[in-house]
Amino acid sequence: MASGGAFCLIANDGKADKIILAQDLLNSRISNIKNVNKSYGKPDPEPTLSQIEETHLVHFNAHFKPYVPVGFEYNKVRPHTGTPTLGNKLTFGIPQYGDFFHDMVGHHILGACHSSWQDAPIQGTSQMGAHGQLQTFPRNGYDWDNQTPLEGAVYTLVDPFGRPIVPGTKNAYRNLVYYCEYPGERLYENVRFDVNGNSLDEYSSDVTTLVRKFCIPGDKMTGYKHLVGQEVSVEGTSGPLLCNIHDLHKPHQSKPILTDENDTQRTCSHTNPKFLSQHFPENSHNIQTAGKQDITPITDATYLDIRRNVHYSCNGPQTPKYYQPPLALWIKLRFWFNENVNLAIPSVSIPFGERFITIKLASQKDLVNEFPGLFVRQSRFIAGRPSRRNIRFKPWFIPGVINEISLTNNELYINNLFVTPEIHNLFVKRVRFSLIRVHKTQVTHTNNNHHDEKLMSALKWPIEYMFIGLKPTWNISDQNPHQHRDWHKFGHVVNAIMQPTHHAEISFQDRDTALPDACSSISDISPITYPITLPIIKNISVTAHGINLIDKFPSKFCSSYIPFHYGGNAIKTPDDPGAMMITFALKPREEYQPSGHINVSRAREFYISWDTDYVGSITTADLVVSASAINFLLLQNGSAVLRYST
């Protein structure tokens, strides 16, 4: 290895550099510190790095402080009261264990589930379906209504995978079952934290949903989905595929040409064969030597590229199956002391207090749904066209009986912190007064056309920011066949269904016709469907005592720009276009120090209004507002209370 030469660092002394680097100030300080140290007779007059850092930043100097010894351990707690079944309440007591308690996560295992066996229908019968639709298994020769003649129509029964089912067979099929999206979020309908009978904070599943939409970073979303039972797609690839590379010429042309305004072709002078051959060495004129150095670029060559297609598939709890295996859920609690270890509650300050976490569980019908296990297949032969056939499918969806899902391993994992006796005694003897942030939520029903305004009477205390969404009542209705998917979305959800028909054409001519007519088509049993969430708020306004804080701002400003600009890494822009954010703080969720608020306990005339083209007497909705409210926690006399209650 060669020896390095002299390295010379050249500092520019322009006006901007003098301000940014302040080299003269740095040199002056070093000289002054040396002179002072010499006057004191110090053997080493050179300044320390800490003295330099009083005026200049040293990028390569790390710092640390000694810290108070601390250890932590997760302790499992079983329910104190309540029967562990879906739809009930569970109460967990927080034991006197450790000096502080911080993080909490609920652990539950939902038992395996499946639907009951059902009899296959007899042809020509009808029956009321799962969502109020009449299901019909028509007679041959009739249309789907079983009344209008349709020549060439033949009907059979198949399962979701196209396998035939014999009509009239007993116990012939079962519906498939699947979980709603994010079942761990929906399982906890309401969570409350009480100390000595005083409710300090509570939140609903809507709050958990909004926290996920705005606050779970993308690099942790996969882990979060695993915890709350949301399936994660798996990536697959095709085999190698050969592609033609075109450069400024018409498709299927081997020479690079352009067409001018007179539709006359001329050679394109912009193509650089030598350049293209470096990036696409697979040359169609010499494919045997593809990838080798001796390929000679040919001006009129068609260059080739070999690629793979990427596909995604899922097989998790949201995928309909005949048998859903047990599902383990890990659900993080969202109280202020769970989010920030700096706000861990000193358990030693509440020695004889009763500390409880109460959880209201969702019912089974909100978590598990059925998918049709039987389909009616229509195969229609076109009269006079014996080679032409059209195949269509419709579901025969009669609700079955899903077995009762057990709820086991009901545990609350509590993160307990331990400190030395000296620090322990400090917290025992002193009164603690700390700033905390609690949830304030309001859900208000609306059915007014075009415009509505609601008083935020449930909100109080200084509010830093609000998450807002208008959720159609249809999204959580039992009549909605997609409520398992729509329950957490703040907008009207429509289905974009891929063209379900595949065509096959045979090139021959019928005897009776002058032109060939032998095109057959077949539909997918379950076509590919993409849900599209349409925001239902056009403009939003916020007023306090008649003063416009936000005056008819477009919803996209609150759903996209506000979370994009504010909050740093603590806030993300949601995928849901109907989820909105309004902030009164400069740095929402970024740091413990408050950076702005509006005190709605003083400004009681606090209204949110909006314009909408969706809401009406039939298409009703619920306004969901989740606010971060500032309060103060007072720990004294063995109890914990909020400083402000109104």
From Swiss-Prot:
Signal peptide: none
One MF term in the entry's GO annotations: structural molecule activity
Tree of life domain: Viruses
InterPro entries linked to this entry: MCP_C (IPR007542), MCP_C_sf (IPR038519), VP_dsDNA_II (IPR016112)
Membrane recorded as keyword: yes
Keywords linked to the UniProt accession: Capsid protein, Host cytoplasm, Host endoplasmic reticulum, Host membrane, Host-virus interaction, Late protein, Membrane, Viral attachment to host cell, Virion, Virus entry into host cell
Alphabetical GO biological process terms: symbiont entry into host cell; virion attachment to host cell
Subcellular location: Virion; Host endoplasmic reticulum membrane; Host cytoplasm, Host cytosol
Entries under Pfam families matching the protein: Capsid_NCLDV
Statement: the UniProt record of this protein carries the keyword Membrane: yes
Membrane topology: Peripheral membrane protein
Cellular component, GO annotation: host cell cytosol; host cell endoplasmic reticulum membrane; membrane; viral capsid
Assembly and oligomerization: Homotrimer. The membrane-bound form, but not the cytosolic one, assembles into large complexes. Interacts with the minor capsid proteins M1249L and p17; these interactions form a rigid zipper structure that stabilizes the capsomers.
Family: Belongs to the NCLDV major capsid protein family.
Record's function text: Capsid protein that self-assembles to form the pseudo-hexameric capsomers of the icosahedral capsid. The capsid is constructed of 2760 pseudo-hexameric capsomers and 12 pentameric capsomers, with a T=277 symmetry, about 200 nm in diameter. The capsid encapsulates the DNA-containing nucleoid, the core shell and the inner membrane. Plays an essential role in virion assembly. Involved in virus attachment to the host cell.
Protein name: Major capsid protein
